[in-house]
């Protein structure tokens, strides 16, 4: 039998040629100088829609599915968004025990939230069918963001699917490199960029902004958002073409049940009591009053409407929103504040006695206790993900226990909201954290929300600043955060208001969070419940949040602590940083780590060594650090020709004396170099244990060191005659 051999490339091409994809379509465009391709009809045919997005060499498969029937007994839209990070996308095997990807990492959770926020408001408000969005990262080119691919692919998949949705949207990142705004910056550009803002928009409005920035001014941030919105129209046009050519008709769905007649009767009968119940700055009082009002509704209407209880949550929401909206459009708020008035503020540092730094920030009934901890760089968080970042030196974690909102519920591991808010505060402080060369510590801040009534994420930003300054971390500038809300009337007029509390967040249309210094913005996160923001609203929000954060800094934070403590806490580890020749690292570590383990045992210090020869020594006390440094200095010591050293005589020979310059490092003083005059015996000039000055005169090709006591003393006498002090 004749054996037929076929090359791999021939086999693959045969498979592709003979496999039929009758519904396959491919759409391409140029996006920021790189090719963007959207493919439909080749993968995941059983999903409502699936789009493979390829941008450069980054590939993300975006699939959307919807349940055929609505979920019973719920008053919310059950949307789930998952961003799956596959390590094969970057050519790596997971480091877990079973070598499988586990639960999503922090960056995966944050990207899921970035995709969720712009698409959620565009679903019908009474849609109750489960909808799943899954973006699987299959290949990563670090010059082309998987996050942007996920946003574009999700938009395209929802738009061409039969799922009711009022898209499409376009998405773009903007950087600031050498003072110029850059669309979708490359990996190298991101490393030097002062801005990383993701902007998602529809054909007319902006629906999502997520930003980290190095104290960027308002006008630069606004211009980046405006330019991104305009550029997004190209993607929207391409997806519009896809919808026209291959889009499916949207399916009909049962609209959420609601008794409008009952609602109107309740409004007419109890409007005055409802306004009285809402008009307070105390969350607990408001809720107690409203519960009493519900009892009155039962007395008035339960007999005629026996099923009214199933509508109570929706009635409460609509009724409260009606009141809050009317008041805000008239220029006042539920707690009596003006629209740009901040709730009462308080700040305190040094709250906890033995921690490295702590800060308590209070704004109305929102209260956050932030605690800073310093450790050696070995405590940096190691990251095993598809992203370029491999470790984090500054970490912020955010916790919201049940008692903070007056609820009796058990403690749970952090959810997506906690991870998202923690990352926002982390991003807000990152630009002012000192570089590792100036402050060689790993830094962790934990923000405990002990009372929650709106804007807790912004409270954690202010609390983090206080805790870091109390810990002696030399941040370059204090950072404050504030949120801005929005109410729009049917005629398009709008009102923005500052420092939203819980009830305003719940019933408002926007939560526009902005953090920064007096110099500029460090972070933005925008959540919406409407169909988007105009440029006028965005500019207004940027302006009023700047004024508000400056007010917070000037009135409460800086009077509390004007600048970072001059030294770290006495309970924080003491740190020394030194640099050695990288070729000497092996000598410091020793065979099997024997040398460094001995140094650690003798000194009690903790030692971290970088590949570039940077060594960080940490210990609870300075003496241990000094001992460890001395040991390392001795190991890496290399004598220099022409230099003077003060050493101990360790051995006598007939031809000279050996003098120890450092432990294990000695040189020979020939008998002719021991004294100014001729001597017959070495013992006539010195004995073992004597200390003497020597000068390095030569280091031969074998590394042997030749010394001279005679030359050293001659140089010392000359320096003393010139008035120099010899140490």
Features from the language model and the residues they span:
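Flexible, glycine/charged-enriched surface loops at secondary-structure junctions
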Residues: 125-131, 166-168, 235-253, 284-285, ...
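Conserved phosphate/anionic-ligand binding catalytic regions in large, soluble enzymes, centered on
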Residues: 49-52, 144-162, 349-372, 453-473, ...
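Extended amphipathic alpha-helical scaffolds
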Residues: 11-67, 252-388, 573-587, 595, ...
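Mobile "lid/hinge" segments at catalytic clefts and subdomain interfaces of large enzymes
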Residues: 162-278, 468-566
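Alpha/propeptide regions of enzymes that mature by internal proteolysis
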Residues: 14-25, 31-34, 48, 59, ...
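Single-stranded RNA-binding regions, centering on S1/OB-family and related RNA-binding modules
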Residues: 571-573, 582-727
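Glycine-rich, flexible beta-strand/loop modules in the N-terminal catalytic cores of phosphate-handling
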Residues: 35, 47-132, 137-144, 203, ...
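Conserved helix-loop functional segments at active or binding sites
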Residues: 117-125, 160, 351, 376-379, ...
């Amino acid at each position: 039998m004749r054996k037929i051999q076929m090359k791999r490339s021939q086999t693959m091409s045969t498979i592709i040629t003979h496999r039929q994809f009758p519904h396959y379509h491919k759409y391409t465009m140029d996006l920021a100088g790189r090719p963007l391709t959207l493919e439909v009809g080749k993968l995941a045919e059983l999903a409502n829609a699936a789009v493979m997005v390829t941008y450069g060499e980054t590939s993300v498969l975006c699939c959307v599915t919807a349940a055929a029937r609505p979920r019973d007994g719920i008053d919310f839209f059950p949307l789930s968004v998952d961003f799956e990070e596959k390590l094969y996308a970057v050519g790596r095997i997971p480091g877990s025990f079973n070598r499988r990807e586990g639960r999503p990492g922090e960056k995966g959770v944050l990207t899921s939230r970035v995709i969720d926020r712009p698409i959620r408001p565009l679903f019908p408000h009474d849609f109750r069918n489960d909808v799943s969005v899954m973006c699987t990262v299959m290949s990563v080119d670090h010059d082309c963001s998987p996050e942007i691919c996920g946003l574009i692919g999700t938009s395209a998949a929802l738009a061409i699917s039969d799922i009711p949705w009022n898209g499409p949207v376009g998405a773009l990142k903007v950087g600031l490199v050498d003072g110029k705004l850059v669309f979708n910056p490359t990996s190298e550009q991101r490393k030097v960029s002062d801005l990383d803002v993701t902007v998602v928009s529809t054909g007319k409005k902006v629906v999502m902004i997520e930003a980290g920035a190095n104290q960027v001014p308002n006008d630069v941030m606004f211009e980046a958002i405006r330019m991104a919105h305009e550029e997004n129209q190209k993607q929207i046009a391409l997806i519009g073409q896809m919808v026209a050519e291959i889009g499916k008709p949207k399916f009909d769905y049962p609209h959420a049940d609601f008794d409008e007649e009952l609602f109107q009767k309740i409004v007419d009968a109890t409007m005055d009591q409802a306004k009285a119940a809402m008009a307070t700055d105390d969350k607990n009082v408001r809720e107690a009053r409203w519960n009493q009002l519900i009892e009155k509704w039962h007395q008035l209407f339960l007999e005629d409407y026996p099923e009214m209880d199933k509508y109570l949550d929706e009635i409460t929401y609509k009724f409260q929103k009606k009141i809050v909206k009317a008041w805000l459009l008239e220029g006042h708020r539920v707690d009596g504040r003006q629209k740009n008035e901040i709730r009462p503020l308080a700040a305190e540092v040094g709250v906890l006695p033995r921690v490295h730094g702590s800060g308590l920030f209070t704004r109305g009934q929102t209260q956050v206790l932030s605690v800073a901890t310093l450790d050696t760089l070995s405590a940096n968080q190691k990251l095993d993900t598809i992203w370029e970042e491999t470790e984090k030196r500054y970490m912020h974690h955010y916790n919201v226990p049940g008692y903070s909102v007056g609820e009796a519920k058990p403690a749970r591991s952090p959810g997506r909201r906690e991870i998202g808010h923690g990352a926002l505060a982390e991003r807000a402080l990152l630009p002012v954290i000192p570089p590792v060369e100036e402050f060689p510590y790993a830094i962790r801040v934990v923000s405990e929300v002990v009372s929650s009534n709106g804007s807790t994420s912004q409270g954690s930003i202010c609390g983090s600043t206080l805790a870091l300054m109390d810990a002696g971390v030399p941040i370059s500038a204090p950072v404050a955060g504030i949120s801005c809300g929005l109410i729009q009337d049917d005629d398009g007029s709008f009102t923005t208001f500052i420092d939203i509390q819980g009830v305003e967040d719940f019933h408002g249309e926007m939560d526009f969070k902005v953090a920064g210094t007096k110099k500029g913005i460090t972070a933005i996160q925008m959540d919406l419940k409407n169909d988007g923001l105009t440029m006028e609203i965005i500019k207004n929000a940027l302006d009023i949040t700047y004024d508000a954060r400056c007010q917070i800094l000037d009135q409460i934070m800086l009077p509390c602590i004007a600048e970072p403590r001059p030294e770290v806490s006495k309970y924080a580890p003491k740190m020394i940083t030194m640099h050695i020749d990288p070729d000497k690292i092996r000598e410091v570590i020793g065979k099997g780590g024997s040398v460094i383990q001995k140094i650690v045992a003798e000194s009690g210090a903790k030692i971290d060594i970088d590949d570039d020869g940077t060594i960080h020594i940490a210990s609870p006390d300075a003496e241990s650090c000094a001992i460890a440094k001395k040991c390392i200095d001795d190991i890496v010591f290399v004598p220099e020709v022409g230099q003077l050293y003060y050493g101990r005589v360790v051995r006598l020979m007939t031809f000279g004396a050996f003098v120890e310059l450092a432990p294990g490092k000695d040189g020979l003083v020939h008998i002719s170099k021991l004294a100014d005059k001729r001597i017959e015996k070495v013992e006539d000039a010195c004995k073992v244990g004597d200390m003497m000055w020597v000068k390095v005169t030569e280091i031969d090709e074998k590394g042997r060191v030749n010394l001279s006591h005679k030359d050293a003393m001659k140089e010392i006498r000359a320096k003393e005659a010139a008035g120099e002090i010899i140490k």
